[in-house]
From Swiss-Prot:
First and last residue of the signal peptide: none
Family: Belongs to the SPT20 family.
PANTHER family (UniProt xref): TRANSCRIPTION FACTOR SPT20 HOMOLOG (PTHR13526:SF18)
Name this polypeptide is given: Transcription factor SPT20 homolog
TM spans (from-to): none
Chain positions covered by the region annotation Disordered: 373-392, 420-507, 641-677, 755-779
Keyword annotations from UniProtKB, A to Z: Autophagy, Developmental protein, Gastrulation, Nucleus, Phosphoprotein
Length: 779
C-alpha cells in the first residue's frame, strides 16, 4: 500500500509538470460559444508556446488580467482605501463610467472574506442582477481589486490592481432558484427541485471518473499549490495587522486595562520604551579598528621615579576620644533632632534622639518616624523602657561620636530625599528619669564581662557572659545591659580611676543560656587553710552581681595590695607583676555602715593580700553577693562544698578578730606560705568602710586552680549561710546546682595542668619547709 501511494504521488507530479510545459489542446464545437473557462485555457496554451522574455520566468500567469484586457470584459471593482476610510464597490454603467454603490468600514469584513475565498457573495446577487451592464460570465463574476493602501502620494494616489474570478456556490444557486420562481407563475416543489438540479449540472466542472489514485493526488497537489498561503494560521497572522485589529488596539489603549491584563500591559509598555531608545553606535571604517587577536603585547617601561604627591590623596584619620576625660552627667540629657522633607507628593518626618543617662558617660541613639504618640515614647530612657524597646536604642559612644552621627544622618536623609531637608533641634534634661525604684534595683540581675586587656595578655576570644536568674524569676532581663543597670553596679559620684571606664558597659551582656558558667561552689561554705574565721554574712534580698574576668594573668607573679579602697587595691597603674582591680570597680568601699565597727576597722587598716605563682591561674569569676565578705575559692573546694550548699536561716554577722593575721601566722607553721601560694585554698576578706553602694554587698572571686590537691593538706570547711531570701528563690538554687556537671568537666580538663605542676609544687614546699618562721600571707 505504501509503495502504491508513492507511485501515485510520483505520477501526480509528472502529470502536473507535463501539463505546465506542454498542455494538451482541446477540441471544441465550431458552432458553440466558448465559455470563460475555455477562453482561459486557450490563453494558457498560447502563453505556454511563447518563449519567455527572461529565463526562469513563466508567461502562463495572470491569465485573467490578460483576458480582461483582450476582450474588455465588464467586472466588479473593489477599492481598498488606506487608514480608516474603508472599502467600496463600484459598477460600470452604459456610458463606461464607474459609479460607487456601497462604502463599508473594515470592521464589516464579511464581504472581504468572500472575496478572499474567490466566492460570489450571496448578498450581492440581487444588486448585480439589477445593474445596467451584465457582469455575469457563465455564472461567474470577474472582480478587480484596486489597493490604494500602498500608495505614498495621497494627492494623486496610485493603486495596485489584480483580478479574481468569483465562482458561484450553493448559496448563490439557491438565491437564483428563489429569484426565478418568484414570478407570477405557480411553481410546485418538484419543479423547484428540477430547476436546482439543472443549474448544478450546468455550473459544475467536468468530473474525472478514472479509478486511479493518481487523480486524487493530482487534485490535492493543485489545491495545495493554490491555497498554500491561505491557511488558517496564515489568516490569523494577517488579521493581527489588519486595519480593524489596529483600530481595536488603539481604542483599547485609551481604556484602563482589566485586572487580568495588568502584567501584559506593563510588559508591553516596557517593550515600547526599550524600542524607543536609540543607541549611537558608530562602526569604524575598515583599517581603523584594532584587531584584539593579532595585536602585539604592550610592554611598558617601569618609570624610574613617580611623583607620589601628584597622585596621592590625603585623608584625615578620625581621632579616638580616649584622650578626652570621661564626663559623668549629673542628670539625663536628651537631644531631639527632627528632620522634615517633602519628596514629591510624600511628606517624610523622622526624629533622631540622642540620650545620656545619669551615671553613664555613653551616648545612646534612637531613630523613629514622628507619630502622634512620639512624646510618650521619648520619655522612656533605654534603662527604663520595656525589654521589647531595647532593640530600638543603639550605643553611640562619646559626644564627638554623637555629633558625627547627627551629621551623617542629615546627609543620608538629604541624599535619599534629593530635596532640601529642614532640621529642628530641641534639648531637654531631667534627673528624675534615671532614678531607679528600690524594687527594680532589687530585681535587677547584673552581669559585666571584662576583656582580658584589663589583666594583660589573655585569651583572644571572650567567653560567653554569665547570667544569674533574677530574684523575681522573670527571664525577660536577658537583653543587653542598659546604661542604668550598669551604672547601678559602677555608680560613683566621681570619675572612676580606670583609664577606660566605658569599656565595661560597652561590652556588657546578659545571657540566660550561659547560667551554667557560674560555679555553685561560689555560694558554698568557704574554707581556709590559714584557719581564718569566716564571717557569716546575712544576705538580703538584693540581686547577685557577677563579673567575669577573662584571660589569665601575665607575668610570673600577681600582687594585689592596698588600703582603704575596694578589695584593698591600689588606684595606680597595672604593673606587669600585679593586677589592679580598681579599674574594674569605682573608687570607694562597698559597705558604708552595714557592718560592725570591728570589721570596718579591719578593712580600713589596709591588709594586703597576694597571689603568686600565677602561671597556673585560670580565668577569675567575681561574684558580688549581698553580704560583707570576699571569698577566694578553688575548684577542689567547690566540689567538696557543693554537697553542703543548702539554704539556711539567716544569722547575725560576726566580726573578725583583729588578731586574725597573727593567729594565722602562728598556727599555720611551715606550710602556711605554700598553701597561700597554691591555688587550692580559700581566703575570706572583709569588705567594709567607704563606698556609695546603696546596700551591703560583697564580692566573691572564684578561681579554678590547676595545681594538684595533695592529701596531706586537710582544708577546714566553713559554712557560708545565706538568708531566707534565697530560700524563697528555689528556682535560682536549682539552676545553680545544675553547674555541678560543668564544674566536673572543668576539673577533668585541669588534670593535665595539675600533673605538669606536681613536681614544681613539691620541690617548692620542701624548700619552704626548711626555712624559719614563714611570712604572714597577705590578704
Amino acid at each position: 500500500m505504501q509503495q502504491a501511494l508513492e507511485l501515485a504521488l510520483d505520477r501526480a507530479e509528472y502529470v502536473i509538470e507535463s501539463a505546465r510545459q506542454r498542455p494538451p489542446k482541446r477540441k471544441y464545437l465550431s458552432s458553440g460559444r466558448k465559455s470563460v473557462f475555455q477562453k482561459l485555457y486557450d490563453l494558457y496554451i498560447e502563453e505556454c508556446e511563447k518563449e519567455p522574455e527572461v529565463k526562469k520566468l513563466r508567461r502562463n500567469v495572470n491569465l485573467l488580467e490578460k483576458l480582461v484586457m483582450q476582450e474588455t470584459l465588464s467586472c466588479l471593482v473593489v477599492n481598498l482605501y488606506p487608514g480608516n476610510e474603508g472599502y467600496s464597490l463600484m459598477l460600470r454603467g452604459k456610458n463606461g463610467s464607474d459609479s460607487e454603490t456601497i462604502r463599508l468600514p473594515y470592521e464589516e469584513g464579511e464581504l472581504l472574506e468572500y472575496l478572499d475565498a474567490e466566492e460570489l457573495p450571496p448578498i450581492l446577487v440581487d444588486l448585480l442582477e439589477k445593474s445596467q451592464v451584465n457582469i455575469f460570465h457563465c455564472g461567474c463574476v470577474i472582480a478587480e481589486i484596486r489597493d490604494y493602501r500602498q500608495s505614498s502620494n495621497m494627492k494623486s494616489p496610485g493603486y495596485q490592481s489584480r483580478h479574481i474570478l468569483l465562482r458561484p456556490t450553493m448559496q448563490t444557486l439557491i438565491c437564483d432558484v428563489h429569484s426565478i420562481t418568484s414570478d407570477n407563475h405557480k411553481w410546485t416543489q418538484e419543479d423547484k427541485l428540477l430547476l436546482e438540479s439543472q443549474l448544478i449540472l450546468a455550473t459544475a466542472e467536468p468530473l474525472c471518473l478514472d479509478p486511479s489514485i493518481a487523480v486524487t493526488c493530482t487534485a490535492n497537489r493543485l489545491l495545495y499549490n493554490k491555497q498554500k498561503m491561505n491557511t488558517r494560521p496564515m489568516k490569523r497572522c494577517f488579521k493581527r495587522y489588519s486595519r480593524s485589529s489596529l483600530n481595536r488596539q488603539q481604542d483599547l489603549s485609551h481604556c484602563p486595562p482589566p485586572p487580568q491584563l495588568r502584567l501584559l500591559d506593563f510588559l508591553q509598555k516596557r517593550k515600547e520604551r526599550k524600542a524607543g531608545q536609540h543607541y549611537d553606535l558608530k562602526i569604524s571604517k575598515a583599517g581603523n579598528c584594532v584587531d584584539m587577536w593579532k595585536r602585539s603585547p604592550c610592554n611598558l617601561a617601569i618609570p624610574s621615579e613617580v611623583d607620589v604627591e601628584k597622585y596621592a590623596k590625603v585623608e584625615k584619620s578620625i581621632k579616638s576620644d580616649d584622650s578626652q576625660p570621661t564626663v559623668w552627667p549629673a542628670h539625663d540629657v536628651k537631644d531631639d533632632y527632627v528632620f522634615e522633607c517633602e519628596a514629591g507628593t510624600q511628606y517624610q518626618k523622622t526624629k533622631l534622639t540622642i540620650l545620656q543617662s545619669l551615671g553613664d558617660p555613653l551616648y545612646y541613639g534612637k531613630i523613629q518616624p514622628c507619630k502622634a504618640d512620639e512624646e510618650s515614647d521619648s520619655q522612656m530612657s533605654p534603662s527604663h523602657s520595656s525589654t521589647d524597646d531595647h532593640s530600638n536604642w543603639f550605643i553611640i559612644g562619646s559626644k564627638t561620636d554623637a555629633e558625627r552621627v547627627v551629621n551623617q544622618y542629615q546627609e543620608l536623609v538629604q541624599n535619599e530625599a534629593k530635596c532640601p531637608v529642614k532640621m529642628s533641634h530641641s534639648s531637654s534634661g531631667s534627673a528624675s528619669l534615671s532614678q531607679v525604684s528600690p524594687g527594680k534595683e532589687t530585681d535587677q540581675t547584673e552581669t559585666v564581662s571584662v576583656q582580658s586587656s584589663v589583666l594583660g595578655k589573655g585569651v583572644k576570644h571572650r567567653p560567653p557572659p554569665i547570667k544569674l536568674p533574677s530574684s523575681s524569676g522573670n527571664s525577660s532581663s536577658g537583653n543587653y545591659f542598659t546604661p542604668q543597670q550598669t551604672s547601678s553596679f559602677l555608680k560613683s559620684p566621681t570619675p572612676p580611676p580606670s583609664s577606660k571606664p566605658s569599656s565595661i558597659p560597652r561590652k556588657s551582656s546578659v545571657d540566660l543560656n550561659q547560667v551554667s558558667m557560674l560555679s555553685p561552689a561560689a555560694l558554698s561554705p568557704a574554707s581556709s587553710s590559714q584557719r581564718t574565721t569566716a564571717t557569716q554574712v546575712m544576705a538580703n534580698s538584693a540581686g547577685l552581681n557577677f563579673i567575669n574576668v577573662v584571660g589569665s594573668v601575665c607575668g610570673a607573679q600577681a600582687l594585689m595590695s592596698g588600703s582603704n579602697p575596694m578589695l584593698g587595691c591600689n588606684t595606680g597603674a597595672i604593673t606587669p607583676a600585679g593586677i589592679n582591680l580598681s579599674g574594674l570597680l569605682p573608687s570607694g568601699g562597698l559597705l558604708p555602715n552595714a557592718l560592725p565597727s570591728a570589721m570596718q576597722a579591719a578593712s580600713q587598716a589596709g591588709v594586703p593580700f597576694g597571689l603568686k605563682n600565677t602561671s597556673s591561674l585560670r580565668p577569675l569569676n567575681l561574684l558580688q553577693l549581698p553580704g560583707g565578705s570576699l571569698i577566694f575559692n578553688t575548684l577542689q573546694q567547690q566540689q567538696q562544698q557543693l554537697s553542703q550548699f543548702t539554704p539556711q536561716q539567716p544569722q547575725q554577722p560576726t566580726t573578725c578578730s583583729p588578731q586574725q593575721p597573727g593567729e594565722q601566722g602562728s598556727e599555720q607553721g611551715s606550710t602556711s606560705q605554700e598553701q597561700a601560694l597554691s591555688a587550692q585554698q580559700a581566703a575570706v576578706i572583709n569588705l567594709t568602710g567607704v563606698g556609695s553602694f546603696m546596700q551591703s554587698q560583697a564580692a566573691v572571686l572564684s578561681q579554678l586552680g590547676s595545681a594538684e590537691n595533695r592529701p596531706e593538706q586537710s582544708l577546714p570547711q566553713q559554712r557560708f549561710q545565706l538568708s531566707s531570701a534565697f530560700q524563697q528563690q528555689q528556682q535560682q538554687i536549682q539552676q545553680l546546682r545544675f553547674l555541678q556537671h560543668q564544674m566536673a568537666m572543668a576539673a577533668a580538663a585541669a588534670q593535665t595542668a595539675q600533673l605538669h605542676h606536681h613536681r614544681h609544687t613539691g620541690s617548692q614546699s620542701k624548700s619552704k619547709m626548711k626555712r624559719g618562721t614563714p611570712t604572714t600571707p597577705k590578704f
